[in-house]
């Protein structure tokens, strides 16, 4: 059971648990537990009703008072998705489908060691292969100062190393050839000599005084700690825990996980020496932001932002993994710039699975309560292993993302959270995976401890949540770690969810099976999440304020073209955006074309991730 407690959408639109007000000052805070939805100052009720279907499964049936006719197909109408036909007929256009005249292929040579000095890179055998045009190394890129690039959180990482590899699978050099098969042969022929060093892979040992300094390239870096962050009142929280009737403790490890989209990452870069412009086809969830970052990397060689055009075609799954700028992208772009021909790089599955990780959080949690289950205090101390660079996309104001939402949907007075992030000899960590800026880790911490408390005092997991929920009349509510919760009715929402799935029947079935020696688990999770990556006063990527834009053109025929700074990876923008516009303009949704993903035509926006834009 998942309870979307206070699911905020600053951008607005349709969220995964209901319809959010998307217009004007009401651009947030309206979901299934609310009594009504605001749209342009007009309130209508009810937004959502639930109808049980086929016993315990419980189908959510959304019933709206539709403003438009079925022919117009505005919000609330069940319509055919406009984008599905091309995918079902195999006519999707992905990055690997892009073919340009004279296009070359790139394959990357990667390090077999987690930590090693590069003694030499011998290109001769590779360059002797017919069809191999170039082998690009860090030394080659260093001549143009293109061998380093920023991450999304103001850290830095190598595009290609010049002397030291920092993690197994790190990019060492790239082979450019007339086709992929020849490029693979060339990569196998490159002879790299290494001097392996003892790798530092234990995040706890990374903080030892005698630990090797992994990032001496960073000015002022004296140890392997990236940052220390804390929020709340340590002393008052410790005192409340010490005085409590019941205290449960646990060290929770959320290990590294990886996005496994059907489509891996890829890029086609084409530099035109005549116009001095770079055209890039890219698997990107945030094309405009990536263009800005690439300009930061390559602006000094003439590739300023207005000379870079990024087109994000159809994307075969994003989940946060296609938000960052990966070294492979920059290498391909640099290769096209240096050679003067289009260069394609498509990550293979093996490469994909050894780069771009999320999580790796070690969380020491303490939850204190009265003997009858009323929570009094929560404390969590976290060690985050970010690998050799911090690849998080967190706002600069919140280096740990939204981890301070870890107090959850519960009412208690005292909380304290702290986090230490460290470097190790692992692939870059901190990449998003299906979460809004560390919310998943935060939710796991508090929910695991609430379940542990329920087991300790032998209380039903649902009952202990009801006992501790923020009450409807307490909103707006100030959390002990500084968040302002605008509205909600958590009790009613969980009650409805339990009714829909038949919770009481499941409990009876569980008891019967346990009597027979069988195991059956029932899981409950309730959470409050900050989503939408906004407003801009609080959220940014490398100083770029988080906002989004739209442009609508109505043709003389009465049809319309709408362009957005977002980018769909399956969210259904072509349908849902058209429905929203149909609602407002009265133009049939079938007559509204949605265009996004091209930085030359779409207005500037920060893309689609962390529940930004409209999932359907």
What is the meaning of each model-derived region?
Residues 1-48, 353:
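C-terminal core of ALDH-fold dehydrogenases
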Residues 70-222, 250, 328, 534:
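Flexible, low-hydrophobicity surface segments
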Residues 77, 83-86, 151, 223-267, ...:
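Glycine-rich loop/linker segments at domain edges
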Residues 108-138, 174-193, 267-339, 395-407, ...:
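Alpha-helical support elements that line or immediately flank enzyme active sites
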Residues 136-170, 204-216, 285, 289, ...:
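Short, surface-exposed loop/turn segments at secondary-structure boundaries that line and modulate
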Residues 138, 305-313, 340-350, 376-381, ...:
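Beta-strand segments within the central parallel beta-sheet cores of soluble alpha/beta enzyme folds
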Residues 171, 177-179, 337-387:
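Phosphate/diphosphate-binding loops
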Residues 212-299, 471-559:
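Helix-loop-helix junctions that connect adjacent transmembrane helices in secondary transporters/permeases
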């Amino acid at each position: 059971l998942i309870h979307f407690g206070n699911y905020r959408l600053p951008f607005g639109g349709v969220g995964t648990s209901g319809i959010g007000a998307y217009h004007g000052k009401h651009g947030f805070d309206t979901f299934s537990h609310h009594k009504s939805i605001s749209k342009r100052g007009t309130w209508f009720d009810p937004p959502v009703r639930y109808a049980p279907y086929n016993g315990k499964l419980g189908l959510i049936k959304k019933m709206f008072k539709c403003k438009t006719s079925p022919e117009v197909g505005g919000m609330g109408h069940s319509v055919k998705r406009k984008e599905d036909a091309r995918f079902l007929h195999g006519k999707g256009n992905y990055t690997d489908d892009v073919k340009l005249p004279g296009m070359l292929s790139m394959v990357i040579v990667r390090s077999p060691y987690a930590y090693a000095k590069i003694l030499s890179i011998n290109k001769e055998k590779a360059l002797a292969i017919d069809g191999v045009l170039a082998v690009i190394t860090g030394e080659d890129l260093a001549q143009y100062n293109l061998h380093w690039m920023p991450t999304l959180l103001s850290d830095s990482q190598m595009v290609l190393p010049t002397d030291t590899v920092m993690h197994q699978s790190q990019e060492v050099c790239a082979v450019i050839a007339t086709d992929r098969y020849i490029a693979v042969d060339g990569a196998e022929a490159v002879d790299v000599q290494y001097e392996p060093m003892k790798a530092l892979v234990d995040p706890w040992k990374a903080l030892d005084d005698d630990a090797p300094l992994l990032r001496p390239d960073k000015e002022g870096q004296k140890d392997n700690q990236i940052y220390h962050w804390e929020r709340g009142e340590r002393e008052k929280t410790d005192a409340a825990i010490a005085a409590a009737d019941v205290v449960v403790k646990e060290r929770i490890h959320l290990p590294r996980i990886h996005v496994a989209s059907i489509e891996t990452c890829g890029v086609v870069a084409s530099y035109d020496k005549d116009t001095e412009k770079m055209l890039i086809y890219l698997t990107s969830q945030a094309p405009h932001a990536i263009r800005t970052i690439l300009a930061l990397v390559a602006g000094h060689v003439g590739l300023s932002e207005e000379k870079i055009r990024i087109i994000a075609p159809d994307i075969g799954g994003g989940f946060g993994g296609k938000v960052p700028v990966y070294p492979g992208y920059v290498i391909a772009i640099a290769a096209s710039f240096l050679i003067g021909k289009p260069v394609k790089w498509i990550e293979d599955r093996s490469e994909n699975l050894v780069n771009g990780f999320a999580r790796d959080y070690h969380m020491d949690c303490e939850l204190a309560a009265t003997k009858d289950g009323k929570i009094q205090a929560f404390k969590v101390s976290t060690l985050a292993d970010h690998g050799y660079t911090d690849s998080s996309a967190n706002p600069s104001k919140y280096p740990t993302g939204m981890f301070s939402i870890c107090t959850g949907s519960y009412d208690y007075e005292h909380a304290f959270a702290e986090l230490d992030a460290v470097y190790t000899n692992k692939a870059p960590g901190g990449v998003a995976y299906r979460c809004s800026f560390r919310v998943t880790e935060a939710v796991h911490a508090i929910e695991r401890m609430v379940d542990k408390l329920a087991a300790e005092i032998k209380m039903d997991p649902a009952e202990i949540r009801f006992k501790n929920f923020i009450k409807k009349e307490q909103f707006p509510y100030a959390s002990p770690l500084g968040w302002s919760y605008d509205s909600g009715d958590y009790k009613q929402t969980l009650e409805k969810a339990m009714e829909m799935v038949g919770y009481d029947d499941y409990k009876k079935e569980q008891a019967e099976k346990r009597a027979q020696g069988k195991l059956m688990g029932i899981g409950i999770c309730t959470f409050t999440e900050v989503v939408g990556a906004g407003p801009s006063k609080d959220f940014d990527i490398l100083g770029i304020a988080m906002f989004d834009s739209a442009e609508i053109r109505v043709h003389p025929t009465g049809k319309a073209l709408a362009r957005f700074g977002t980018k769909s990876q399956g969210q259904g923008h072509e349908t849902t955006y058209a429905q929203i516009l149909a609602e407002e303009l009265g133009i049939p949704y079938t007559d509204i074309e949605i265009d996004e993903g091209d930085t030359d035509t779409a207005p500037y926006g920060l893309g689609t991730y962390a529940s930004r834009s409209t999932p359907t």
